[in-house]
Curated annotation (Swiss-Prot):
Protein task: Snake venom serine protease that may act in the hemostasis system of the prey.
Organism: Protobothrops mucrosquamatus (Taiwan habu)
Protein name listed in UniProt: Snake venom serine protease serpentokallikrein-1
Glycosylation sites: 81, 105, 156, 172
Signal peptide: 1-18
Propeptide feature: residues: 19-24
Active-site residues from the entry: 67 (charge relay system), 112 (charge relay system), 206 (charge relay system)
Length: 260
C-alpha cells in the first residue's frame, strides 16, 4: 500500500512538472491545422527565406506589419507545415503595398502596419478563409490568441515547421510603458502577454494576428532580443484604430486623409 502511494505521488509530480514545462514553450502548442485559415506566410521571393506572418482580411487583401516589407515578397496561403507543400496551398504576389501615411498624433509604433493587395483574389476553401475586421475595440483583460511560425525557444532560437498557438492577456498600455521606457507616454498600440513570462510571440511571428475574443485586434510588432521574459509583454499594432484607413484603401480611395 505504501509503495502504491509513493508511485502515485511520483506520477502526480511528473504530470505537474510536464504541465509547467509545456507552458514555457514560446508560442504555446502546435496550432490545429484548421484553426488558422486566415494566417499567411510571407517569404522573400528571391531567397525563399521566411520573413513574417500576415492575416488574410479579404479575398484580395492581406494585413501585416510595415517592418516586414522587402522588395520582392511571395505570400503563401493555406500553409501549415513549411517543410511540406500541399496541393491546397496557394501562392500570391503583391500587386501593391500600402503604408499608413499619417504622422500627426501617430508614432512609429502606431504605424507599423502594411496593407497588401494580392495580384489575384483567393477563393475560400477548407484551409483558406479571411477573418473579419473588428467591429469594436478590444477590452483590457481580454484573452487573446497568438499564432505564427516564430521562434519557440529564446534566446537560443529554434523555429518550428508548423505554426504554434497560445493564449495571452490584454493589458493596459501602461504595463508595456513600464516594461519599455523608450515607448512614448501615449500610444495607439496594444499591450499583451503573460506577466509571469514563458509564453510570447517571438522573432518570426512579426506581422501575424492577435485575436481577442474572436476578433482580429492586433498585429505583432518586432520584439526585443529575448522573448517571453517575466513582466515583459509585447506591443501590437492596434487594428481597430486603423479601420477607416483600411476600409478606404480596400474601397479604392487611395488618397485617404489622416484621422484626427
Amino acid at each position: 500500500m505504501v509503495l502504491i502511494r509513493v508511485l502515485a505521488n511520483l506520477l502526480i509530480l511528473q504530470l505537474s512538472y510536464a504541465q509547467r514545462t509545456s507552458e514555457l514553450v514560446i508560442g504555446g502548442d502546435e496550432c490545429n491545422i484548421n484553426e488558422h485559415r486566415f494566417l499567411v506566410a510571407l517569404h522573400d521571393a528571391l531567397s525563399g527565406r521566411f520573413l513574417c506572418g500576415g492575416t488574410l482580411i479579404h479575398p484580395e487583401w492581406v494585413l501585416t506589419a510595415a517592418h516586414c516589407n522587402t522588395h520582392f515578397i511571395i505570400i503563401y496561403l493555406g500553409a501549415h507545415n513549411q517543410s511540406v507543400e500541399f496541393d491546397y496551398e496557394e501562392t500570391r504576389y503583391p500587386e501593391k503595398k500600402y503604408f499608413f501615411p499619417c504622422s500627426k498624433n501617430y508614432t512609429k509604433w502606431d504605424k507599423d502596419i502594411m496593407l497588401i493587395r494580392l495580384y489575384s483574389p483567393v477563393r475560400n476553401s477548407k484551409h483558406i478563409a479571411p477573418i473579419s475586421l473588428p467591429s469594436s475595440p478590444p477590452s483590457v483583460g481580454s484573452v487573446c490568441r497568438i499564432m505564427g511560425w516564430g521562434a519557440i525557444t529564446s534566446p537560443n532560437e529554434t523555429f518550428p515547421d508548423v505554426p504554434h498557438c497560445a493564449n495571452i492577456n490584454l493589458f493596459n498600455y501602461t504595463v508595456c510603458r513600464a516594461a519599455y521606457p523608450e515607448l512614448p507616454a501615449t500610444s495607439r498600440t496594444l499591450c499583451a502577454g503573460i506577466l509571469e513570462g514563458g509564453i510570447d510571440t517571438c522573432h518570426g511571428d512579426s506581422g501575424g494576428p492577435l485575436i481577442c475574443n474572436g476578433q482580429f485586434q492586433g498585429i505583432v510588432q518586432a520584439g526585443g532580443k529575448t522573448c517571453a521574459r517575466p513582466r515583459k509583454p509585447a506591443v501590437y499594432t492596434n487594428v481597430f484604430d486603423h479601420l477607416d484607413w483600411i476600409k478606404s484603401i480596400i474601397a479604392g480611395n487611395t488618397a485617404v486623409t489622416c484621422p484626427p
